[in-house]
């Protein structure tokens, strides 16, 4: 195995693939739990984050760490905490991400610009959005806007339950903790769809540790950075990834089809824990009603890719 090289004070691209190549980000709950864990650990361990982009079955980040040990401890700790919460929600055990994680040092401004474009353009390449900043989970839109995906939130005029939730969220953040699935489910059950999106933006803004100014410094301005992302998708030759030319929109399609079938949010989140027989039934159902390829449906349902059905 190639020995990992970490250069103190330099940007590094870190890539994580799920252990069985299965989907782990099914809903906004998964993204918010991951993000608040990630940001809490970055803040506690002094890691600078230039870019973060969780995708349905993998994640990209560009970070600056003081040492190899600091980077490894950071990645291992947030990965363990997220796996714990994700598994507890689904009554499962085990690792979520493959080990070891992939990383590559980026030395010089050109290399950093290239990998920032690559990381942030992943959702564009996977046909989820037309522009990197339109994907909520690149967090680019939060640089100069605290509510880019919801209506402005006026705390003093919010309903009583919303104010109570905001107070609880602030306390959680001040205590250095992260948001859990049970907290999100409780809040969402008492809020309207509009309020729920406001709360999601509020949580992201409160925990966000991305060093936008440092990322922007490689381009001169925020707008110049975005234009660079629009013009060049970037590249990565030092980390091995399994690429295909298919869109990730099929995972959202699978969710919509199952929702139309009558599956609740709780039932959807339990998909990875279903017995194989039930997964097989859903496998053929999704193949007949979406454009997803067999391997993509298997990844969505957490069926081994080499299993013949």
Model-identified regions with their sequence ranges:
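Short Pro-Cys-Gly-centered "Cys-loop" motif that presents a nucleophilic cysteine in a tight turn
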Residues: 1-51, 65-309
């Amino acid at each position: 195995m190639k020995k990992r090289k970490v250069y103190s004070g330099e940007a590094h691209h870190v890539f994580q693939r799920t252990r069985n190549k299965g989907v782990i980000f099914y809903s906004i709950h998964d993204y918010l739990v991951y993000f608040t864990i990630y940001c809490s650990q970055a803040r506690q361990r002094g890691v600078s984050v230039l870019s973060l982009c969780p995708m349905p079955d993998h994640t990209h980040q560009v970070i600056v760490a003081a040492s190899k040990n600091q980077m490894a401890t950071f990645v291992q700790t947030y990965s363990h905490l997220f796996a714990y919460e994700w598994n507890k929600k689904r009554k499962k055990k085990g690792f979520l991400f493959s080990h070891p994680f992939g990383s590559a040092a980026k030395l010089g401004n050109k290399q950093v610009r290239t990998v920032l474009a690559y990381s942030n353009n992943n959702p564009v390449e996977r046909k989820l959005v037309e522009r990197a900043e339109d994907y909520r989970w690149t967090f680019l839109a939060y640089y100069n806007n605290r509510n880019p995906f919801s209506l402005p939130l006026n705390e003093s005029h919010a309903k009583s339950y919303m104010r109570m939730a905001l107070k609880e969220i602030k306390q959680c953040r001040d205590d250095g903790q992260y948001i859990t699935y049970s907290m999100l489910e409780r809040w969402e059950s008492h809020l309207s769809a509009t309020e729920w999106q406001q709360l999601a933006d509020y949580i992201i803004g409160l925990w966000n540790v991305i060093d936008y100014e440092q990322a922007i410094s490689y381009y001169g301005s925020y707008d110049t950075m975005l234009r660079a992302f629009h013009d060049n998708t970037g590249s990565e030759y030092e980390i091995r990834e399994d690429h295909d030319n298919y869109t990730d929109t099929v995972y959202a399609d699978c969710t919509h089809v199952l929702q139309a079938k009558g599956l609740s949010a709780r039932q959807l989140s339990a998909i990875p824990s279903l017995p194989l027989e039930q997964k097989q039934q859903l496998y053929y159902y999704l193949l007949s009603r979406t454009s997803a390829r067999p391997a993509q449906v298997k990844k969505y349902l957490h069926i081994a890719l080499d299993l013949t059905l």
